[in-house]
């Protein structure tokens, strides 16, 4: 845990008592603050009260004595409208911040030179965060990983000289971190997302840009420049004096890092040097993972990791569960769990990575469906449709892709396995990449992916892939 000493002797309101909120309560208390905790969910309030914290309906308290409101990132700050707790804080002149802001203040007070890598982007954040942490750990560093990837930042060990904090940040968390100052900031990409919370793509992109604009003066901004929003951000912060490393997987760069036929190449001053070859690394398959690997490599290089050891460390990366996770193999068939593919944009990356696909898709449908994937339909040998979206997806696939409505994973997995094994194809892939949310049949995408893995490994003759 990171004791938060910057509010010692003061009273702090904490609203939103999930994982990060509860961790904030503990960290503030450990640092000497008095904590008043609030939440719109009665069960969360009861849990925090059982942990020994004072709870209150923050609508009915005076805000004049609060030094700050620590807000969970899931609570609306601006759109569609500010949460009532935000309005109450602003009316009382109380600053509204998040748990990563508390971390930044502690780092500034106690270990300002401790390496801090912050990662954001519409897609690829978690994989890149895990990969940076893996590369730094394999290079012999003391590494703490957390943030949006799952472990609340204040639950990690405190910043200190030589300890590297690798932190995934959502746009909501960036909004709540005015003192953000990473040693290395990574912006992977920007595409329309979370506009219900940001209003416009312009505002969403501006929030993402804040992370790289906040890089310390001696630090490095790593920016994927294959979309207009990120490319413009890179130009703007470079003009402001920041050191920028541009990354592209779509075209060679005269100054920056590009990926050419699985080779990560750095160019500068007319010279080129190969950093690594990621061909054949299952956990980094696909162009999207090539971008993740290139950005992670750029961050590791900026922190002093030698180019000579990056190759072996990239190859040993195990990947993340539910993201192009290879879970089993039987004869000619590979089984891939991409349950995190919850929309067409994410599933496009999975379909682009294989040529002979037996595709399990469906769930709670997202706006736009799977029509944007039409160019990839020739890769699909057969589709197995599940959940609420099954009929809608069947209508899109009619006359273009052979399909069956399986209804459930329990029916889809053995059917896809049977057809793939009997196809005679040398590289058949049974791919779960639903292009849908999971909430019609599962608690979350993790539960859906876990069930897929269980069903695959229960099939006769399947060998788990470590």
UniProtKB/Swiss-Prot annotation:
- Annotated signal sequence is none
| GO-annotated cellular components | cytoplasm
Q: Where in the cell is it found?
A: Cytoplasm
The pathway it acts in is: Cell wall biogenesis; peptidoglycan biosynthesis
Any Pfam family the entry gives: Mur_ligase_M
Recorded catalytic reaction(s): these are: UDP-N-acetyl-alpha-D-muramoyl-L-alanine + D-glutamate + ATP = UDP-N-acetyl-alpha-D-muramoyl-L-alanyl-D-glutamate + ADP + phosphate + H(+)
Q: Which family does it belong to?
A: Belongs to the MurCDEF family.
Name-wise, this protein is: UDP-N-acetylmuramoylalanine--D-glutamate ligase
